[in-house]
Amino acid sequence: DYIIQIDETPVFGLTLNEAVELMRGKKGEPIVITISRANTEPFEIEIIRDYIKIRSVKSEVLNNIGYLRITSFNEQTESGLLNAIKKIEKENKIKGYVLDVRSNPGGLLTQAVKVTDIFLERGEIVSTRGRDKKDIRRYRAKKSDRTNGKPLVVIIDGGSASASEIVAGALQDHKRAIIIGTQSFGKGSVQTIIPFQVSNSDNLTGIRLTTARYYTPSGESIQGKGIVPDIIIEQGEFESFDYKRFSESDLKDSLDKNNEEDVEENEDNELSEFEKRLEIDYQLRRAFDLVQGVSLFNETQE
């Protein structure tokens, strides 16, 4: 389905932000959107405006390592990420961070730039380049690293696209983070819709043209190539081994336990939902291991 009109205004030629702005209004007010669907005539749907809260950032802490999951890049992503980091740093002695943008299809370019800026001190984040060599726009880091240079591992996969690739590519080029997982999608084009009206008709139509491409700080095009991880880790199954649960009774020929009946708690109930996820998410487990290893190495160098 395609939204082709919002109330009386055609959306052809509008940017995403402009179209979203047209949809906004007071809670409870009606809005009519016109939908185009294959093999059917355009039809109208009336909906009632309401508050929509999309939480694009989720966070957890395990073994003093902060986990930051970004599911999309919307207008609240930067503030959500900053709040998550602030809370994590306040309540824990953090060794490093895991940033997870797997299956993140992207979103707002401005938010991708701001999110990257949270982890960088300086330097270029991304550039857009058109056919004309003079048609170049560069986005640079403006703020200091909010995580104070702590070890950072970013997880990507084939579902990481657009804004996700901008973040991963910039952090990789500046050697600020280690990128793991699998090659990203490769959506690095800037597209513009040019509207026009068909002669002898009241219908508006348009042509969507690729007018520019995204480039990482090192000058690599994201389009069609994607971001190749520093360490390629396929998602797979593995047999979990938790050193916390290993004891002498697990050793061969160890002494028997006392004959007294022990009341054992169900270990599964002791694990948080996030710890259970670590048990089955191979890429995530390796990311935590990597942050732990880099943190230990850095401590030996101090």
Model-derived features: positions:
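Aromatic-patch recognition
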Residues: 189-191, 208-211, 223
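Cleft-lining beta-strand/loop regions that shape enzyme active-site pockets
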Residues: 4-197
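Conserved functional hotspot residues or short segments at active or partner-binding sites
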Residues: 213-302
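Beta-strand scaffold of nucleotide-dependent catalytic cores
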Residues: 45-47, 209-210, 219
